[in-house]
Structure formats: structure tokens, C-alpha cells
Amino acid sequence: LQAYDLEGSIDDRRRPLVRIETPGFTDPLVAFVDTGFNGALLIDERQAARLRFSVARDSIKPVQLASQRNEDFRLGQGSFIWLGERRTIVAYVLIETPDERRARTARKTEEEILIGTELLWDCRLEIDFPARKVLISKVVERVTGPPHDHIGNQRSL
């Protein structure tokens, strides 16, 4: 492995994940890899605060989930260390009632986040389901960047 490789696994629910050491958290964050999510991160409000992300209360972004359910998220901006590189990114932040938050956190045993294709844009992602292994490797050759920004707007190349 090289310094910019991240190894992970497949959990019992067949979800690819990696563990990320992150300032502000005692234990590594469990980051589920979601190639159907074209943003960088999906986090909750508490995680956004611990990551010191700036979340604008009026920055509501409607999103249609893979389940076809519509949900609103806030947008938060901050600095995140990804594969040894500090990046300024925009995260989707869950909007939850206190009851929803309690129910979700009761189901978790660890801090969980979702990483999407915006973070994976300059990476090679290998998922080996039979071996239950995940490998994310940073590609050394520079790529110009994703053809869309973090909220799905077309970029000119």
C-alpha cells in the first residue's frame, strides 16, 4: 500500500466501507462508499459541528434519493482530510427532528458518514465482494475535476 491508499471492508449488510481518522473524533469515522451519491460527504448536524463545517441554515438543497423519496438537506462547507490531502468541500447535512436523531443514533454503534463520487473523482475504487475488501487509491496523474460540481450543475471543461 502507498500512503494515499485506504483499505476497507464489506459489512454484513454488503455495504462497502472504510474507516477514516478524522480530527475532532476519538474513533475513526465509518465511511460508507456510495457511488450513487455524487456529492462529497453526507453527515449529520452533530458531525458537521465537530468537523467545524459552516452550515448555512437557509441553504436547503432538495434531493431525490435512490429510493425515489425526496428529502431536504442543508449544505455545509469545510475542510476535510481525504487521503492525506486537505480539501475544502461541501457536505450534505441531514435535517432531523430530535426524535429522528435519537432513533437513528440508537441504531448505530459507531460514527457513520457517507462518501460520494466527488471525493472519489481522482481515485481508483476496488470493491471485491467475495473477499469482502475495499481499496481506495489516489491516482497520481492529475485529473481536471468532475464534470459536475457538488450540487449537480454542469461544469464547462
Predicted regions and their residues:
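Pepsin/retropepsin-fold aspartyl endopeptidases
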Residues: 1-157
